[in-house]
Regions:
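Conserved phosphate/ATP/ADP-binding segment of small-molecule kinases
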Residues: 14-91
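Phosphate-handling active-site elements
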Residues: 90-92, 118-132
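Conserved beta-loop-beta/alpha segment of the NTase-like Rossmann-fold superfamily
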Residues: 5-7
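Short, small-residue alpha-helix embedded
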Residues: 39-40, 101-125
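Charged C-terminal helix
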Residues: 126-165
């Protein structure tokens, strides 16, 4: 869902979030909330990776879909994303060192689009998430450095690479 910005600003009305919960989430294969979105969906503050995984599992069970709880909004040196399914405690955890850059605008949308594309190519979900994360990481490293503040990613750096590389 694109519900809450990095700044903490709510991007859509609460009734739209209720509609997403009621109509969209039960149809979804995967939802990819960032930490503020996950906290909003869970209705509580999440203080550590255990609480994040528990909240993601609760949401996965409620909506019978997978949840990729993204860890980019923490202050940790490593970003941990946790993938859980509706019938599992924890499917997988993915971790990488944080890249020190302000050029991260669009990382969540890029990741969810990459995963959806890879699923469309027939890759299993966990593999699609792993490759999608690698794609986003390379795009962050190739960011052109435009403007001030949170700049765009460098998607062009990876356009000619195979989806399985």
């Amino acid at each position: 869902p694109v519900m809450i910005a990095t700044s903490g600003a709510t991007l859509i009305a609460e009734d739209a979030i209720a509609e997403m919960r009621a109509r969209l989430f039960p149809l979804a294969t995967l939802i990819t909330p960032n930490l503020p979105e996950l906290e909003h969906l869970a209705g509580r503050t999440l203080r550590d990776t255990v609480e994040v995984a528990d909240a993601a599992a609760e949401i996965a069970r409620t909506y019978a879909c997978h949840v990729l709880a993204k860890g980019g909004h923490t202050d940790d040196e490593r970003i941990i994303d946790t993938l859980v399914g509706p019938g599992e405690e924890r499917s997988a955890a993915f971790g990488d060192p944080r890249i020190d850059t302000p050029h991260t605008h669009g990382t969540g949308c890029t990741l969810s689009s990459a995963v959806a594309t890879l699923l469309g190519h027939g890759l299993p979900l966990e593999h699609a998430v792993r490759i999608g994360r690698q794609f986003v990481r390379r795009a962050i490293l190739a960011a052109p450095g435009f403007g001030q503040g949170n700049g765009p990613l460098g998607h062009q750096a990876v356009r000619n690479q195979s989806p399985s590389s």
